[in-house]
Amino acid sequence: MLLSHKTSIKICPEYSNIIGHMCYAASKLWNVCNYERHHYKELGLEKYPDWYYQKKAHKGDLWYRQLPSQTAQETCKQLDKAWKSFYVLKKTGGIKEPNPPRFKQDNIPVTYMQMGIRHEKGSDQLRLSLPKDLKSYMEETYGIHEKFLYLENKIFRNMDHIKQLRIYPPENGTCELIVIYEIEEPEQLSQNGHYLSVDLGLHNLMTCYDSGNGRTFILGRKYLSLERYFHKEIARVQSVWYAQQSERGIKYPKSSKHIQRLYRKKQNAVKDYLHKTTRWIAEYCRKEDIRCVVVGDIRNIRKEKDMGHKTNQKFHGLPYNRLYIMLEYKLKLYGIQLIKQEESYTSQCSPLSPEVSNRYAEASNRKERGIYITDGVRYNADAVGSFNILRKYLSVSGKQKELYVTGLKTPEIIKVAA
């Protein structure tokens, strides 16, 4: 089982110079190979230059030799994946008039493969190899005599099998890393009839129903607040920055470092919050001995739907796929199974209806926002949705279990990282 961990480390000026040069060389290698793919007919090539051709043809090039061999090959491979994605989109029409991969204007991350990394078990230090041409260039140009790169961080201690290390261009003496490492895959637990169903939404990011005690609770109400705060702040800074450029006669305003920093901060804040909410669910399942989590499958729910520009911005920004990935691997660490269940009519059917289907769907029962009323009884609409998702899964899989509706009226609000 492969896991990734993102962290940042402080580096000395010599290391910053070396890593920065490798990131620069990677961007130049990308551009050379990309130009070759764009203009292979004008260059007189008989066949389209794929990854196998380019990693051999450019082996003696300047920028290729400034990188470790496998790192240079991985750069060519990432470009190859980008072009394959472009052709798939062009063929399937996933995006109208897709653009081919662009040329890189800035430095790009470099990826060290397993052969270029040396790590002793239990050590907090990594040793990275450097290519011969890069070492001689650094020695002649800057007087840097480093033979290897030694990176230290406490997270390396618990990583026995490091597969990849992705290094981002350094900024202000710090460098971001993504470490991909392998662990032994936990054995999946046998089912005990205890389920947790999850309904994804906007205002209530995750509404959960516990089949063991009928408890319902809501997680993730801070998500929209984070999105709203950063959108307003980015819009405020953009309006000031663009107005200043317009006064100077700039026809096409450019972004600023402040705006880019806000985008990064927003991305990190949302990602951190999603990690904390999914971790809370995984720990809850472990403590309550829940061995199966059923989550509503909302993929393609946004397709060909227009709900107004405000709701569209919220709905299309919902990172549901990232939630699925985070939930799946965190639950997998405890041997808990994750199942995605198609959720049509789960929000319209009464929790007391014989089955969840179009026949018993009553959209008019949702009288107010967040309230579902049937036979004079008021339920929380999202709690009804999570309850019906579990009912639908049990019906489809041919399983039977007695479920309680008493907890659907007033779900508990769980505050995570508030």
What annotation goes with each model-predicted range?
Residues 8, 78, 127, 176-178, ...:
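Beta-strand secondary-structure signal
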Residues 1-74:
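Gly/serine-rich nucleotide phosphate-binding loop at the start of the catalytic core
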Residues 6-8, 147-148, 164, 195:
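Well-ordered beta-strand positions in beta-sheet-rich domains
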Residues 49-170, 317:
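Acidic carboxylate diad motif detector
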Residues 3, 17, 171-418:
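Positively charged, helix-rich recognition surfaces that bind polyanionic ligands
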Residues 34-37, 41, 83, 87-94, ...:
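Long, hydrophobic, amphipathic alpha-helical segments used as structural scaffolds
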Residues 26, 75-83, 259-267:
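Short amphipathic alpha-helical coiled-coil/interface segments
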Residues 33, 74-86, 383-393:
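Stable alpha-helical structural segments in soluble proteins, enriched in small hydrophobic residues
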